[in-house]
Amino acid sequence: MNRPPLPPLREDLLSIWTAGVDAVRAPRLMRQAVQSDARQLTVCGETWLWSDLGRLIVIGAGKAGAGMAGALEEILGPEIVQQRVTGWVNVPADCVRGLRRITLHPGRPAGVNEPTAEGLFGSERILELASSLRPVDLCLVLISGGGSALLPAPVAGISLGDKQAVTRFLMSSGATINELNTVRKRLSRIKGGGLALACGNVQVGNQGADTPRSPAGGGLAAAGGQSRVVSLIISDVVGDPLDIIASGPTVLDTSSPRQALEILKKFGAAPPHVPQAVFDVLEQAAQRWSAPLPLPDTIRNVVIGNNAVALSAAAARAVELGYRVESLGSDNQGEASAVGRELARRCLAERATTSRPRPVCLLSGGEPIVHLTATARPRRGGRNQQLVLAALLELESAGLEDIALLAGGTDGEDGPTDAAGALLDSEVRNQALSLDLDPQDFLQRCDAYSFFEPCGGLVLTGPTHTNVMDLRVALIR
């Protein structure tokens, strides 16, 4: 019996990619993590009786913050929310909406991933709420990707402008998220466990912040009178390192000021691009630094969503559509153009083989970087658009009739643009040829957006209210 014709590759690309993103949307993840009724509250397997609890403080930051906070209020219900909840969450400006008791504060404009004065104002409010915690209160911290830029709280001697300058320098120099956040933590009162230490009635204990606890029940009495802090985390970092996601506001920071200085040295940081005050503060801190004591076991950090969850859901959808799935993992990093060329070569290898059945779907995740040059900075684009454009250069001579690929940020953002990423198929290539667009020229200028916009290759989703790095789908028919 003959197989019916496959649907257009573009339709399948979008269906598979969307299935991955839908699986990590904040409301879905929150419903899996939190359950509540009139008698009790359960968070990631740990249960408290409402009769044992005072206030429920909700604080946090990130691109998924609005979705997480809104879902939490729905789970709790209006009566409990009105009686128990007070909260403040810093989110991108385009995510702000009205909730009953949790303030969603615009900590930065959409598409501007750096600290702002509005973010600083919100961070001070978050610190105030944290310090007001009583032994009978419970604190839920909602953390997701983008939280670092949304939680600026400079240490003494550093201004907000200094933080902005060092952030811009490292991002434009190709620093990894781990390197960027290592420096951010050493310049912040919130990051690197600072928020946990700000929580009222929390004392230094004998157990690390990321140590799992068995469900205890019995409310906060089981915590020896200390405040209970539970961080619900949607990871946007390869390997889910708790100290790097949003710069670990509730996780012990084991890095040192000297490591931050070494990172700045690696990228050739110096005044005026990085203010002298940054070096002065780090040098002074390095001279008096000693290994920190562990945070108490009354602080719990739980990853409720990550890139692997998105990949799994995308794979399931691909199988439904009749594809054999090959997963290339969630840890694809490196320079975006190189990652794109390698993905294209893998597509060609799959097309050339006769030992494995087709159609095939290649899935991968991660977060590559783009090295900007002085001439590239005014252009428009992002890492995913750059990746797909590089793949086109590798594939254009081989033909694209039976190959298509898509790379997009699960947060709906790709660089300082309104696109989540880009897709490539024969239609995009043919349109580029008809417009006489040279992909190599646009790639060298880091201007991929201007290439894909007239070709119909941009992936435009708007904010997805989640963030688990990037998701890439390649189809070979």
What is the role of each PLM region?
Residues 59-61, 88-91, 140-145, 171, ...:
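Short beta-strand segments
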Residues 384-477:
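Internal helix-turn-beta structural module
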Residues 135-139, 147-208, 213-246, 254-260, ...:
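Conserved phosphate- and dinucleotide-binding cores of soluble alpha/beta proteins
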Residues 1-57, 66-79, 113-135, 304-310, ...:
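N-terminal glycine-/serine-/threonine-rich phosphate-binding loop
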